Amino acid sequence: NDLESDFKEGGFLIKSVINYTTEPNLNTDLKLIEDLKSKLIDIIFVYSKRAADQLLKIILNHKIENNLDNCTLNCISINVANTLKRLRWKKIKIFSPGDEELSLL
């Protein structure tokens, strides 16, 4: 599903502009790892597929997937949640942008 290609095939003239780019943070705070291992984190918010990929990598690299059973995962979309679904979460919730506080209820 490439939207640009679909428009071009439909006869539209398209000019692509890259709004922004992101780079993964390669420096994981060791306090975060210790807090996850100690089950001190109750909720994690994930706002993008890329962030979900990074979180999955951190969890698997540090072998803390078994420490997530009392943590709730709040994701901005089902696509984001599906990336992390295979891990043991107490709960997975989907929220809308701006409604993060409502997902805490």
Where are the regions that the model predicts?
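Conserved beta-alpha
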Residues: N1-L105
